[in-house]
Amino acid sequence: MALPALGLDSWSFLGLFLFQLLLLFLPPATTAGREGQGPTPRVKYHAGDGRRALSFFHQKGLQDFDTLLLSDDGGTLYVGAREAILALNIEDPGVPRLKNMIPWPASDRKKSECAFKRKSNETQCFNFIRVLVSFNSTHLYACGTFAFSPACTFIELQDSRLLPISEDRVVEGKGQSPFDPTHKHTAVMADGMLYSGTMNNFLGSEPILLRTLGSQPVLKTDNFLRWLQPDASFVAAIPSTQVVYFFFEETASEFEFFEKLRISRVAQVCKNDVGGEKLLQKKWTTFLKAQLLCTQPEQLPFNVIRHAVLQADNSSTDPQVYAVFTSQWHVGGTRSSAVCAFSLKDIKSVFEGKYKELDKETSRWTTYEYPDISPRPGSCSKGPSSDKALTFMKDHFLMDEPVVGTPLLVKSGVEYTWLAVETAQGIDGQSHLVMYLGTSTGSLHKAVVSGDHSAYLVEEIQLFPDPEPVRNLQLAPTQGAVFVGFSGGIWKVPRANCSVYESCMDCVLARDPHCAWDPESQTCRLLPTPILKSWKQDMQQGNPEWACASGPMGRSLGPRSRPQIIKEVLAVPNSILELPCPQSSALASYHWSHGVEAIPEAPSTVYNGSLLLLLRDGAGGLYQCWATENDFSYPVVSYWVHSQDQPLALDPKLAGIPRERMEAPLTRVGGGAALAAPKSYWPHFLTVTVLLALVLSGALVTFLVSPLGALRARGKVQGCGTLPSREKAPLSSEQCLQPSKEGRTSASDMDADNNLQGTEVA
């Protein structure tokens, strides 16, 4: 729209001048959420943000809520904390409710022994619960560090409540729980037997894979044969039909590298393994391990595995293992993380492939072809293995080929520590993989994997105001929530926050499989079961122009430029206004318009998304902040700006749109107050005014000092500015005394004190 010529009276000239100075002294604008490489969370909630409803459970005197177990019926969450085990009722909405709690502290004798071994009695010499699994419908099985003396026990259940632990049922837990609470570990119950991976000694230098409980014989890895490196660190155990897979990382022995190279592994042991009769007695006879490779082309690999889970989808013929990786190298000085998917078929295929063999003469690993032994060594065949097969297995436990994963999500500047996954069915009938990722700084990311096997981030929730790692994640599908364990308690996070999307287009652009637009209630809601086809969702493209095109959309589409509500700003002339633009999506780009034109030539600037405007004659009218996302543009907020001196009638095209008046004062140049947005720039105005006064004062002083200096220079003795005193070296006839035409500064005119002599009177 054409703008009238602006007259410059004294106040408007001063306002224009101060407005330009204000822009010079504004602090640097902040950049929104595009830190690092990889997908950006569309919506980010800071700690305490009221838009994201969270529930928090804590118990006075307890800490280190590290171990979580969901009951079979999904209504109870069992929690292993420091020296206590809790049962929480999670069926009711809101904060989880404590059913009961049983203490399980380390004995005083064990704590004294722990302190005697130079361990901290403030942070280490306690019983940290590390294993909490369901043994059957009436008992849990728990293990703890027990002040560096691991112990285990059965816990009886009665109506999902925990019965007290009997001391005579506490047994040694070596090999099932770590000694040190900081050591990583894993354990899983499969077919009534406990498979655990942990450190087996006080020093933390003897890793072990152990099978206990059940009817099968107790088996473990052979430490003498170095099947595992001394620094092996276990992160997950996943049972399959015939085998149990262990996921861990250790120092690589098969590669020559200029530094200590960490490598991620998957190992397998057969469930029907009974150990050897002569060789490998009470040892695994089916232990094999292979490299896990999670990398992008021409990039350093993500070689440190942090966690892994199996997506148990009954409809899938090829189950997938999803694992979180970081890198031991900080590329660009920042941490980076990746999520890779591994097919169980690919893992099985690698374990059926070629082996590696250590050449004892060169100390190098070489490829070994298939052995001429039947059944194949390491296979889950029935019956005892031959001595030839067992001899072969002692030295051929490493597979030649790696298991190559598919990168789904790669992000720099973040370190993922935990992972939970589920599938969600959309309106299109397709299943969509949803991942919940905990970070080392206390955030929770919700990611969705699209059809091209790449993930996008729906939201980021900062759980803690201060950085603190997520200790554990437990998904409760029947409750529609994710439970997050950390040092001080348990967070209950609803897995979707549909109500934050206020329009159909915002709901569709979010591409959250749990959310869809209900045209009847005109709200974005959780997708019901069974799915209603009349609801609006587009998981493939996120195109609101297509998804919201038909049916009653409420506050959704219509003419794109037509706002949903107009915020009326009635201000005085020459006032500095801030018109905020709520940036609900970090994936959108934002720009401002004035009517149907671009921002006018009136003094204005965009600062942190907000429009700073000096209101002058002709600068009123409709101001709109626009968002463009996924090639779709829509107005985010609309302002009708006019002055108190010359009210501007609302454009007839905007008739019928609800209006909201803004009544917050802002700076006015020349006195008075303006009505606009809630933030005041009065401090900036004062700063600019003071600086202007200082500049003017400095200029005035400079102007006055220059002539005074010239006058003073004329009054000085020519030649030397000052004459030395009598205590200094006497002046020579050539020093500083130049003959003058008037003869008043010759040596004969000076007395002994270097003073000018007067004329004698006769």
UniProtKB/Swiss-Prot annotation:
Residues 33-684 are extracellular. The keyword Mitochondrion does not apply. Residues 37-495 form the Sema domain. Glycans are attached at N121, N136, N314, N497, N608. GO terms for cellular component: plasma membrane. Residues 706-762 are cytoplasmic. Residues 1-32 form the signal peptide. Keywords: Adaptive immunity, Angiogenesis, Cell membrane, Developmental protein, Differentiation, Disulfide bond, Glycoprotein, Immunity, Immunoglobulin domain, Membrane, Neurogenesis, Signal, Transmembrane, Transmembrane helix. It is a single-pass type I membrane protein. Residues 574-632 form the Ig-like C2-type domain. It is found in: Cell membrane. Residues 722-762 are annotated as: Disordered. Residues 497-544 form the PSI domain. Belongs to the semaphorin family. Cell surface receptor for PLXNB1, PLXNB2, PLXNB3 and PLXND1 that plays an important role in cell-cell signaling. Regulates glutamatergic and GABAergic synapse development. Promotes the development of inhibitory synapses in a PLXNB1-dependent manner and promotes the development of excitatory synapses in a PLXNB2-dependent manner. Plays a role in priming antigen-specific T-cells, promotes differentiation of Th1 T-helper cells, and thereby contributes to adaptive immunity. Promotes phosphorylation of TIMD2. Inhibits angiogenesis. Promotes axon growth cone collapse. Interacts with PLXNB1, PLXNB2, PLXNB3, PLXND1 and TIMD2. This is Semaphorin-4A. The gene is SEMA4A.
